[in-house]
Amino acid sequence: MSKFVKTAIAAAMVMGAFTSTATIAAGNNGTARFYGTIEDSVCSIVPDDHKLEVDMGDIGAEKLKNNGTTTPKNFQIRLQDCVFDTQETMTTTFTGTVSSANSGNYYTIFNTDTGAAFNNVSLAIGDSLGTSYKSGMGIDQKIVKDTATNKGKAKQTLNFKAWLVGAADAPDLGNFEANTTFQITYL
């Protein structure tokens, strides 16, 4: 191989190294936002659970006529990093807009397109057995204890049910949502 060819190959290799380094060095930039809340509490809510979304599914209007109800949908609030001392009970209190569509323990559901309240249907939230609770009324659940220490375990799960409740007449049709807040206290 001639000296010229060897020099050309070496030069090409060096240029290729610089080119690939330049290509590797190029990239993307962005930002990361880390957020949360430090609260005076014995537990932390699992990050995915502090903003719950419960998919109630596609519901046939016929099921809700004549005071019908849907099959309850289970949902949970998971707790972690709990440090219990003498606490025995966790009380979860849901609050939201109370429905005028049905008398009872129910929350208003709103049309996601118009923002208007649905007629003849509302949302019930209840304990794991399916007993509905009024807005602002606490749902008690026992703290699961560690048998070795007789103190609450570091991880706890609060179990609930949600379902729709119809009225005598047919409900409005369309996409809906109901928004509530919840607070957990430890006694």
UniProtKB/Swiss-Prot annotation:
The annotated phenotype of a deletion mutant is:
Deletion of the operon under classical laboratory conditions does not result in any major effect on E.coli capacity to form biofilms compared with the wild-type strain.
Superkingdom of the organism of origin: Bacteria
UniProtKB keywords: Signal
Q: Spell out the disulfide connections.
A: none
UniProt KW Thylakoid keyword = no
Q: Name one GO biological process term.
A: cell adhesion
Regulation: induction: Expression is negatively regulated by H-NS and subjected to cAMP receptor protein (CRP)-mediated catabolite repression.
A GO CC term assigned to this protein in UniProt: pilus
Q: Keyword check for Signal, yes or no.
A: yes
The region annotated as signal peptide is 1-25
PANTHER family tied to this protein: FIMBRIAL SUBUNIT, FIMBRIAL SUBUNIT ELFA-RELATED
Q: What is the recorded function of this protein according to its Swiss-Prot or TrEMBL entry?
A: Part of the yfcOPQRSUV fimbrial operon. Could contribute to adhesion to various surfaces in specific environmental niches. Increases adhesion to eukaryotic T24 bladder epithelial cells in the absence of fim genes.
Further information in the entry reads:
The operon is cryptic under classical laboratory conditions, but is functional when constitutively expressed.
Q: Which family does it belong to?
A: Belongs to the fimbrial protein family.
Record-given protein name: Uncharacterized fimbrial-like protein YfcV
